[in-house]
Amino acid sequence: MIVEVELGFLLSTLFFTIISIILFYFFINNKNNLIDQCQEVTKLNNKDNKIVNNNNNNYNNNNFNKIEEINDDKNKEIIKLINNSNNKNLKIKIQEIDSGNNNNNNNNNNNNNNNNLNKNSNEIFRNFKIFSGSLLVIDQDLNIISSSESVRDIFSNINDINGVNQQVIGSLQNYSFINLVHQKDKDRVSTFLKLKFKNNNNIKHQQFSEDIINEKDELKEIQIEDNKELIIINNNNNNNNDNVLKFGNNNSNNSSIILFQGVYHLNNTDLSKPFNLQVSILPFISENYIVLSLKDLSPPPLRLLLNKTSSALSPRSLSSSSSSSPSSSNNNGNTNNSGSLSPRSSNSNGSAVSPRNVSSNSMSPRGQNSDRSISSPRGSSSSSSSSSNELAISPRNSNGTISSPRTSNLSIESVLNNKSIDMISHLSHELRTPIHSVIASIQLFRSTILTVTQNEYLSIIDTSANTLLELVSNVLDYKRIRSGKLTLNNVDFNLCHVIEDVCAMVSPQAQAKSLQIASFIFIHCPLSFYGDPIRLRQVLLNLIGNGLKYTNKGQVCISVEPEQVNEHCMYLHFQVKDSGIGIKEENMSKLFAGFSQVNNGGTTQEALGSGLGLAISKDLVELMGGKIWCSSNATQNNGEAGCTFHFVIPLETNPKQLPCPIQNFNGLSVLVVDKNPYIQTVLCQYLEGWNCQVIKSSDIKEASNKLKDLRREQIEVVMIDIDNIDFRDFIQFKDAFNRLEFGRIGLITMSSDRSMVNEMGFGTSKLTKPFRQSHLVACLLASMPEHSSSTTNCFSNIVGMNSNINNNNNINNNSNNNNNNMQTHNSNSVYGNGNYGNCTPFSNNNNRIHMMSSGDKPSINNRRMSISLGKIPTFNSGGSNSPRSKKLFEEVLQQQQLQQQLQQQLQQQQQLQQQQQQQQQQQQQQQQQLQQQQQQLNTIDDDSNNYCNTTGTMDSIDEINKNNYSDSESDELNDDQAPIIAPVQQLSFGRVTRRHSIDIIMFENSRELSELRNLEDSTRYLSPRSMNNNNGNNDNGINGGSGNSLFGSSIKEEIGGTSDTSSLAQSPNSLSPRAPTKIMILDDNPVSLKLMQRILESRGFECYPFDCSEKAVAQLDQVNPAIIFMDCEMPKMNGFECTQLIRKREQESLCLLKDRKIIIALTAHINPEIQVKCFDAGMNDFISKPFKPQCLELILRKWEDCISNNQLNYNNSLINNQTTIQEQV
């Protein structure tokens, strides 16, 4: 029942997450509709504004554009427009309208009328409705007299419109409105405007009936028939001056709106490029002047829409009184509504809306005065160009003049991109939080007992959640790259590991489609490069993922070759080649465009995705200073389809690093059987580069014939891919190989399915594809035949040699020895430049002469010796007389002597065991007393299951000795009789299922592999010295105290074994019990808080969850946690402020550095700026949601020393308490 409830909880959480994503896409795709809705007409209130129609009660507005109610701010704008006119007469006459009415009223009306008309001039326009747009006043010569500030949102030459340039040069000529009209429409617009002036002269104001006028003689608005304008009349105002702007009706049947094409658009880099404009004649009636309302009909760019939308909907808006009406969209920057849809606001003095104020630097992450560095994908073309501290976001500079359209366009683009990034980043944070809850719940759910159907449902939920997370991350990365806010790291990394980890990550996806994955890195690849491995991995994953989507049969291969090598830099050429459908030539231009997918005509589009992978890859490669392109074979008819993505990037190298090691197998003859020619080519390239003689075969029957026809000495190792072969043929080959060639030729079986390799139970070594270089080398070493000329036969020969070796005689003189008839073979040794020196194998080119007779028993297996040494050959040998060869012989002799010492120690241990049996009774009594004392004092419990005791070790050594020196052994060692020189296998080769074979482990992802590598570095292997002076009752760990490690018990589990402990925190200590580590969790999201608590408690930690930072700080001293997981986004006091408060308290209390709390940031943000902010606040580490439990364990493992320090303090306090109790007793 509980399982079903939890499953229902998961499904409901995923449902709400999917709904959020759908709403997010609906919001992005319908932003144009959102802007249009924001510009809807604001209807007049019938109580305040009464509309009268002579014919009917319907408000017919067919001849008008979208109109808006004039508020006080718009009244001020019109008054300012007219008063700021350069025409002195116009300005005077307008003032006469405001004050001259009083004079007329004094002569014709009583004092009551004076009180009604002696009002603020804004009342003239109170009930008046105008067209939304930018206002212009022109005279009869069509010259611009005055303009509103909102004209700046349309035209780039605002200085010419306002007459600024004319005043500078001393000219008195006004700027003609016709200059703003495109050449083909100038005559039509000019005729239209002049006709309007002519019609204004024939207007008669006495045409309205007295019945329409209200008794109060105030301003009223009247709507009359179609094709007639809106008018406002004042019965008491009879001023007939022609220079006065009056309100009246135009009796002309001509429309008052005209559409045409204009020039000098703000968003056009080409000033002569036309754009659509609409001009409406406002009902200001004058003989000499006309007021025009202009509206830009050109489609606004997407970035402008995103900016407007984010300004209206962002929770971080500058003002809570923001308006979404069209009146604020054309704001000139002088109003108090700072949160409007206008790209300018009053808080920035007319500059575009920005998350920073005017005094901050440029929106570029490098500041405004810095040069364009490698972090910009656009190069120097988008560099900041301003010497002042103002943002380069407005077409006006600090002097009020207009910059060039191209410069202003780039500046606006930068600001709008940054604003849209803030919006998407906020949405990304809100989406990643529920996704984290889904993924964490899945991990907890999988730890319970589930049915097959439930596991299937969980897999679907897990896949959907990860796809959702990938989509959100891609959208955010795309916007950050395009805005230039993404920076690259420059760290040391291993290129080979990065590429092989990528292949391992996409291997399950390829295996689901029965595709092959392979990678080839050039042989002389340096071990170390400097660059950003995370972004390089992202590019490779995108390209490989694209190849897997469009490939149904075949393979996807990666290759890396050097293109240009400099002293401190190397240009590497990456190729990702697939065998898919290919890309047509006409679709190449659309390939790297964002939010697009290419469809090759008749090919069915089965691959789905956001269309951002290739666009992000292109930007990242350009950000690294490289280039990317694609070549395709889709148009060829030779059967070779598919495409290849190329990109070249420079990577810095370390000139002080050692030369790259090169494996040398001394002409080892290898038969490669693989039906896939591409995978076979990759294998052959590696083998030939490692000095192997390669024989190719594409059919297993052909391989069997070659084994029969060729001499046995000419084929030493067979590599066979069992994925693409017939099962019957493989069974026949297996039977023939076991009957004829077993023990003489090594066999490596390869498969993409690990379970298939294990079920076969056939072969000397097993290799899982996609293979790694280190795994391939290990399999070759393990599969070499016992007496191959390519192996280090010197090891086996040393055992049977006489005293010539002990006397350090020259090996070349062995040709005169009757027992050793050998010749020196001066070829490349399989061992070179290792810690064990160079070794030269001795053999004859025609006859392989072995030193051991049929009755000799080899005490050392060559293959096991090569594995135990842990060194792979690198450079060529210097010959049999080289000091390294002699040193190698001495090392082997020391190994033999050490083994003899082990045998003597075994005999001594047997004697000690007999003595121990006589003392058992005394020891039992002592143990009973000790157990009673331990129970009383709550001392340490014995946990012998997690440690190897001496008796068990001696038994294993007895078994090894028995296998090594049994009289019933034959010349050729069987699988169960192979002697081992090292008691513990190397972790890098994984778990060995058969003593005569090596089983290569392919990890699921790179994180597990990196964790294992960290464990290998910190692990001390079992050595013979650790067995000295240990008896059967010793409870101390034989690994030299590694049991004190917090995560020591998980090493065995990481490499494929089982661990007795179920959690990291429950790892036993050899000296004291493990104290549960206290962890405090701060998160305002109850779902995330509960899941985090469940994950940590399941691993044995003691958790203290808090949903409020104030409560957590108040109980901090009482709880005294070792680790604090801090959510950055919390109400009241956020995570940054809480961390600063904790650090301040620690400083005031003079807390030592080792005693400070470990604070780990827990947030859904993935921006580098947030990480820097976390570290600046005093946090120790950073983990981004959603995360997997393995990632959490890795974070905790990094702070193992601090946790151990707290554990030591706990142990000391426990010992002190026990001492006090004992003294009291």
Curated annotation (Swiss-Prot):
- The Response regulatory domain is annotated at 669-784, 1078-1200
Low complexity bias (residue ranges): 313-356, 370-388, 1023-1037
**Biological function:** Acts in a signal transduction pathway that regulates the slug versus culmination choice. Believed to be the first component of a phosphorelay that couples the sensing of ammonia to the modulation of PKA activity and hence activates culmination and spore germination. Ammonium transporters amtA and amtC are thought to respectively activate and inhibit dhkC phosphorelay. This protein probably undergoes an ATP-dependent autophosphorylation at conserved His residue in the kinase core, and a phosphoryl group is then transferred to a conserved aspartate residue in the receiver domain.
- Identify the taxonomic lineage of the organism of origin: Eukaryota, Amoebozoa, Evosea, Eumycetozoa, Dictyostelia
> Ranges for the Histidine kinase domain?
426-653
Enzyme class (EC, first level) = transferase
Tell me which InterPro entries the record gives.
CheY-like_superfamily, HATPase_C_sf, His_kinase_dom, HisK_dim/P_dom, HisK_dim/P_sf, Sig_transdc_His_kin-like_C, Sig_transdc_resp-reg_receiver
Residues crossing the lipid bilayer are 8-28
Q: Give the Phosphohistidine positions (modified residues).
A: H429
This protein's species is Dictyostelium discoideum
Q: Which residues carry this modification: 4-aspartylphosphate?
A: D721, D1127
Q: What is this protein called?
A: Hybrid signal transduction histidine kinase C
Q: Which terms does the UniProt entry file under GO BP?
A: positive regulation of chemotaxis to cAMP by DIF-2; response to ammonium ion; signal transduction involved in cellular response to ammonium ion; sorocarp development; spore germination
Locations of Polar residues compositional bias?
357-368, 389-407, 945-954, 1058-1072
One GO molecular function term of this record is: ATP binding
- Subcellular location, in the record's words? Membrane
Q: Where is this region: Disordered?
A: 313-407, 809-832, 941-974, 1021-1076
